[in-house]
Curated annotation (Swiss-Prot):
Annotated family: Belongs to the FARP (FMRFamide related peptide) family.
GO (cellular component) term, any one: extracellular space
Modified residues (Phenylalanine amide): F93, F111, F129, F147, F169, F180, F205
GO biological process, one term: sleep
Keywords: Amidation, Cleavage on pair of basic residues, Neuropeptide, Repeat, Secreted, Signal
Gene Ontology MF annotations: neuropeptide Y receptor binding
InterPro entries documented for this protein: FMRFamide-related_np
Coiled coil: none
Record's keyword annotation contains Signal: yes
Stated name of the protein: FMRFamide-like neuropeptide 18
PTM text: May be processed by convertase egl-3.
UniProt-annotated location(s): Secreted
Function: FMRFamide-like neuropeptides. Ligand to G-protein coupled receptor npr-1. Involved in modulating locomotion quiescence during the sleep-like state called lethargus which occurs during molting between larval and adult stages, acting via npr-1. Together with flp-1, plays a homeostatic role by acting on the GABAergic neural transmission at neuromuscular junctions to prevent overexcitation of the locomotor circuit. Plays a role in the navigational capacity of sperm and the targeting of sperm derived from males to the fertilization site in the uterus of hermaphrodites.
């Protein structure tokens, strides 16, 4: 008898626990007066499908912007002269500076074609993470991850352009280079260092 009473007690506890688990929560709705300014901002940022997006900075360079499509033109003088023209398909995360410097803060992820300078063109499919230096120097800090073709350093330091498919982390002359592709066909000495050849498909990490 005591055995069955224990079973019934356990069953009742389980039933009560299940009933409490399915209890609907009660929410308190607080009605507040919304200022007219907030209503206007919400209307301006509301899309046709009802989605509301946060307002961007005045200069259009708010960090953390994920954008797909075409921005305003630099030479068209739409709203301001600091807007940069880019082809559709640009995916960028990060804040850029003004168009005369063409700088990007670390954390820029971009896919698309850059064509604001003829000597700095990149083929479509460029994936780059890192900060670029002054555009006339064409240098990049360590931490650049890029997939695409480089063709603007063909005349400097006896370096030829690289074939598409180059994956590189770090600067060219610092230890820790991870690269897939063809380096150079030259066997000449530069600054006392022998330029080594690499066949396409070489994955290397370490010193040159």
């Amino acid at each position: 008898m005591q055995r069955w009473s224990g079973v019934l007690l356990i069953s009742l506890c389980c039933l009560l626990r299940g009933a409490l688990a399915y209890t609907e929560p009660i929410y308190e709705i607080v009605e507040e007066d919304i200022p007219a300014e907030d209503i206007e901002v919400t209307r301006t940022n509301e899309k046709q499908d009802g989605r509301v997006f946060s307002k961007r900075d005045f200069d259009g360079a708010m960090p953390g912007v994920l954008r797909f499509g075409k921005r305003g033109g630099v030479w068209e003088k739409r709203e301001s002269s600091v807007q940069k023209k880019e082809m559709p398909g640009v995916l960028r995360f990060g804040k850029r500076a003004y168009f005369d410097e063409k700088k990007s803060v670390p954390g820029v992820l971009r896919f698309g074609k850059r064509s604001y300078f003829d000597e700095k063109k990149s083929v479509p499919g460029v994936l780059r993470f890192g900060k670029r230096d002054v555009p006339m120097d064409k240098r990049e800090i360590p931490g650049v991850l890029r997939f695409g073709k480089r063709d603007y350093m063909a005349d400097s330091f006896d370096k030829r352009s690289e074939v598409p498919g180059v994956l590189r982390f770090g600067k060219r002359d610092v230890p820790g280079v991870l690269r897939f592709g063809k380096r150079s066909d030259l066997e000449e000495h530069y600054a006392g260092v022998l330029l080594k050849k690499s066949v396409p498909g070489v994955l290397r990490f370490g010193r040159k």
